[in-house]
């Protein structure tokens, strides 16, 4: 990384402070990547976790407003607090099921819900959730 010369009279940052700042930026960020058994990819940067799910499923009779557990996360990917986010859940005809969401419990269970008013058959789940891991 090239160092930028800010010594132009408009900055109050001295050269030693700037060099320290620049060198810290130049350090490589440690990114851990993991793909679980259902093909969901997790990226962990420090404690920040990005979960990206594109799961083709065959889930029959997903009840209205009842949790369905997809998987349980390894401890290092579990959130510090309950995480709830939007999920695109499609039925067997690949039509969107309205009012669908996903949650990740602090115990690691990844659950989906649908609130369409009736029982649905699920064919696909798409979701991206970003959260802070407990550790």
Which residues does each predicted region cover?
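Solvent-exposed strand-to-loop "edge" motifs in beta-rich extracellular domains
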Residues: 54-56, 75-78
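Short amphipathic beta-strand and strand-loop transition segments with alternating hydrophobic
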Residues: 38-44
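Short, hydrophobic/aromatic-rich segments at coil-to-beta transitions
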Residues: 23-31, 78-87
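N-terminal low-complexity, intrinsically disordered "leader/linker" segments enriched in small/polar
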Residues: 1-30
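Short, well-ordered beta-strand segments enriched in hydrophobic/aromatic residues
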Residues: 47-57
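Extracellular jelly-roll beta-sandwich "head" domains, especially the C-terminal globular C1q domain
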Residues: 36, 61-72, 80-135
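Extracellular/surface recognition and adhesion modules
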Residues: 18, 42, 49-51, 73
């Amino acid at each position: 990384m090239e160092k930028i010369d800010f010594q132009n009279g408009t900055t109050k940052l001295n050269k030693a402070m700037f060099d320290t700042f620049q060198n810290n930026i130049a350090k490589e960020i440690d990114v851990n990547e993991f793909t679980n058994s259902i093909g969901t990819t997790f990226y962990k940067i420090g404690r920040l976790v990005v979960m990206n799910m594109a799961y083709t499923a065959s889930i029959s009779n997903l009840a209205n407003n009842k949790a369905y557990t997809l998987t349980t996360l390894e401890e290092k990917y579990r959130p510090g607090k309950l995480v709830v986010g939007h999920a695109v859940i499609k039925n067997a005809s690949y039509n969107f099921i309205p009012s669908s969401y996903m949650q990740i419990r602090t115990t690691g269970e990844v659950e989906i819900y649908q609130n369409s008013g009736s029982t649905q058959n699920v064919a696909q789940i798409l979701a991206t959730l970003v959260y802070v891991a407990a550790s």
